[in-house]
Structure formats: C-alpha cells, structure tokens
Amino acid sequence: MKQTIPVIGMACSACSANIEKKLNTLKGVNSASVSLPGRSALIDFNPQVISLEKMKAEINALGYDLVIDKETSVDEIEKREYVLLKRKTALSWLFSIAVMCVSMRWIDLGSRDITNQVALLIALANMLYCGRQFYVSSFRQLRHGSANMDTLVALSTGIAFLFSTFNTFWGDAVWASRGVVWHTYFDASVMIITFVLTGRLLEEKAKDGTASSIRQMMGMAPKTAHIVDGDKIEEVPLSTIEVGDILEVRPGEKVPVDGEVIWAESFMTADAAYVDESMITGEPTPAEKKKGSKVLAGTIPSQGKFRMRARQVGEDTALAHIIKMVQEAQGSKAPVQRIVDKAALVFVPVVACIALVTFLLWWLIGGNSALPQAIMSAVAVLVIACPCAMGLATPTALMVGIGKAAQKQILIKDAAALESLRKVDVLVTDKTGTLTIPNKNIDFTKADNLPFEERETLKPNAREAMDELQKKGIEVYMMSGDKDEAARYWAEKAGIKHYHSKVLPQDKENLVRQLQAAGKRVAMVGDGINDTQALALADVSIAIGKGTDVAMDVAQVTLMGDDLSAIPEAIQLSRNTVRMIWENLFWAFIYNIVCIPLAAGLLYAFGIDWQITPSWASALMAFSSVSVVLNSLRLRWMK
C-alpha cells in the first residue's frame, strides 16, 4: 500500500535524504520519497511485513518523527513548533544584542576578564536554550553515522565558543607570552545561531505558501454534518458518518461526503436544489440536483437544500482522492532531484573536510595570529555552506507548480509527468466527449435522422485551446470514428489541421506509435475506454475528469472540468516549473561555489585583505535558503 505520512523535525535536505535512505533500507518498504517542503514521506510498503509503528521507531532513532496517528493534528504540532521557533528566534536576537553591547564595550563592565565572562554566560545561555536542537540533532546524527545542516551549525558554534572560552581563562598565559594578540568570538557563536534561526523562521513562513493549495483543498471538507434520525436532525462530527446515513445539507453549507440526493427543494423549483461544484470541476454555473443526482464532498448548495444518502465517506470521497493524488504528486521527485539528494548526503562531510583543510592551511601560513585566523576561517566555511538551498530548489518549485495546477482543476500524477509535459510537441485528441459534447437541445430518439453538425456541439473554449496549443508550436491531430465529411467539419470548426476519420481504438494507438517513431513527444487526450490503449502508450496521457474511471486511472494528467484551455495552461505551467527548478539549482550551486572559497579566505592569495566573517556567513546562509523558496513562490503569479 502507498501512504503519505507527515514528518516532523526536518531542517534541511540532508535530513530528508537521511530519512529517505533509512526508510528504503527497511524490509517491507518498496520505495520511499521524502519531501522537505511538504514535510511528508510518500511510502510504498507491505503492511504484512512492516508496520507503521516499526517505521516510526526507526525514524525516531534518527531524531525525527513520523505522525502515524490519524487523530493527531499535524497542523497543531506544526503551529506549536512555529511558535517555539519564533520565541527562540526573538530571544536569540536579544542575546545577540546583549553580547554585541558587551563585546564592543558599548556597556562598560570594567576589566576585560569580566567582559569576556559575561559574554561567555550570554553565549552559553543562547546555545543551551535557543540552539539546543542543533546539538541534540547533530549528536543523534553522529550516532547513526550521518550528518546534516545541524552538524555544521553545532560544529561552527561549538568551535567558536570553546576557543573563546579557552582564551577567556588562559589567553594571557598562553598567547600573550608569545606576543600574540588574542580575542574572543562569543559574538560569532551567538550571531550564527541567531541568523540560522531567523533563516528557518522565514523559510517556514515561505514554505507555508508552497503548501497553501493543499490546505485550501483540505479546508473544503466540513468538520461536522447534519444527520437525519427520524424526526430529529443532529449536528455530528464528520468522522462519525457512515455509508447509508441520511444527511441534510442547507444553503451555504459544504457537502460532507459523496452521496445521492433523495429529496431536494429550492425557491426556484419544488424538486431541485442548485450546487456550486466549481471547486471540483471548474464549472462556474451551479449544477441542478434532483432525486437520484450524485453530489460530491466539498461542493456547496447555492440555492435550496436537500437530503442525501451517504455513498462514499472518509478517504473514499472524490475530494479525498484528489487531495491524496495531489499530495503524492507533490511528494514525488523529478529525476534531477535524485542527483541532488545524493549530493546532499555527501555535502556535509565534504564541507567538513574543506573546513579542516582551510584550518590547516591558515595554521601553516598564518604567522603570529595563525591559530585564531585558522579557527575563524574554518568556522566561516562550516557556517556558509548550505545544503538547504540545493535541497529546496526542486521540491519547492514542484509543490507550487502542482498545487497551482490543482487549483485550476488540473491533477498531475507526479513530478515526472509535470516534467514531461514541457517536452510535448504533438497532441492527439479524441473527438466525441473530448472536443465535442452531445447537443442538449435535440430529441435523442430522433438524433440518427439529424445532420451530424446538429447532433453535437463544440465544447466552449475548444477552438481557443487548440489555437493556443498551435501558437506554442504543438501540432494537433484529431481522431474520430465519424465519416470523412463529419471529421473534416469538426476539425475545421476546432481549428485543427490534421485529422483522421473512421478510426478504431487500434488506429489511435498506431498513430501515437508512428509519431513517436518520427521523434515526436506525444500527448494523448481522451475520455473513454476506447482511448486507454493510446493513453497508455503516449509520452503524456491526459484524461477528461468526467470520462471513464479507466481513462483517469491510466492518465498522468486529469482535467476535472470540460474546459480544454486547461491543456495549454498545464503545458505552460510545466515549462515555467522546470525553468524555475533549474534557476533555483543554478543559484544554489553558484552560492556554494562562490561563497565557500570567500569564507575560506581565498582573496588573500590575490592580495585582497578580506574574507567573509562567521557572522556574515550565517546571514548569507539563511538568505540563500529563503531566496530559493521565495523564488519558487513566483510561480503562483506567472502566466
């Protein structure tokens, strides 16, 4: 079975990579993919071999937590953690101001010894309370032979603090006798923690934006429902509703579960209500619901009220299925992310080695102040290195892109489908049910005697959608079982240059094969069982949501409504998202490639007496992560 499980405690890409690596080593886990911005793990496992409790215990040992109890509110846990992070960040800023006032002698405490001892106490308090998680996490990682961003923070602040403590008590005895001017760096150890916490606070706030679409979908389901029990109507928790229960839904209320209308009324008609289904289908006109009509969870009666019999409840509703599909898509990984994850696993050890080399080089060539210079340069290297920016580059863009698609009633199966969409250069479309719909104004008992152009009508926006696709350089082929005259008529009406008539299901599959053999990347759009072979063969398969379940199961992209303009929108969104991923990765790698040598003091080799200090390094590191998330959020406003 496949399940998306919330994960608590991740701070960087090394965290998610370590959790993913651990899960994939467990017997009974077929595959696991961990999303840092999504704060979740998508796990495909055999429950007869391994339980959720066993997985939770293994991840707890690493210092993280899998939330497997469905009664536990993940939102409440995350809110508490966010409030605690805000409190620690604010207090750390106060500690930073205090230590700066003392270290810079803005507050005169008399002797240098007293000044250093007060700074030591401030730094220690900051480390023990505000920075405690860095040391606890890095210790747990060390026990399991792994490392993450917390390891770099713990190492850098620990080294700066211990060296400063040594100088506070033994500086004169050890350094002054050798003619070396010594300093303490408590301000650096405090400021590093402050800037890292500030960066994480801003990052969490920004990451909330990437998950806004899924939260909006979850908010579509009500917390309670009105259950009819004889002559009584009671308001009960949604979780208590069972299949077969009779429910009453009033104007403005959200439909609690999927079901069938058994009675309806409104001021317009005595036997029907009107329900806004735009949040599911994108259709702006309220749908008429009479006895026997199907209603979906999350939709809202705009006029009238009705009673319904519950048919699908809980995780079986269409809304729950959509939410699950979007969560799985957001938790999936683009091919490039696999490479980044491997880099994240070795990034921290590599940075630690670079810091060690930096220390040794400065110690050997640094002259009288060799040791202090060597230590501060190594600390700056440890602080400025940022695996978070690399780790966030791909998943944040994917979360925003897939979430934006879902808000437009476009369901994308996974990251690979989103990435493939941008490469499409040919679209093959079915006619009946995809481009056209039956004419509602005719008597269907006499339809066979009517001209073909009167039996069907072109879907609204179909012509505009086909024109937009062709403007994007995508060839469109229409497949129809009609005779040539009818097929040519509908192709011309839709603005399609290439069409095939009298086709059988096998012909659709053959056309897809021929186009692929010619080097084309083919997208197939259809809505029926006779399209499934071609859908399965296409590079990208697109199903109409009102089509058959078989077509939707095969498809990589599902359009929940009838508006075909969603197809060019999906392709443009794919192009924007992939471009954003590469943009994010470029800046994340450039940041590390440029900043690590500058922190190590490379400019001294060219006669420039400047390098990035540990305090500035921590600020730059925080900025790099936040900037990647904010850059991804630009997708929400891109057209």
How should these model regions be labeled?
Residues 1-116, 140, 216, 232-233, ...:
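Flexible metal-binding regulatory segments at protein termini and peripheral loops
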Residues 175, 188-251, 289, 411-413, ...:
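Juxtamembrane coupling segments of multi-pass membrane pumps/enzymes
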Residues 280, 376, 386-447, 451, ...:
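Conserved catalytic phosphorylation-site environment of P-type ATPases
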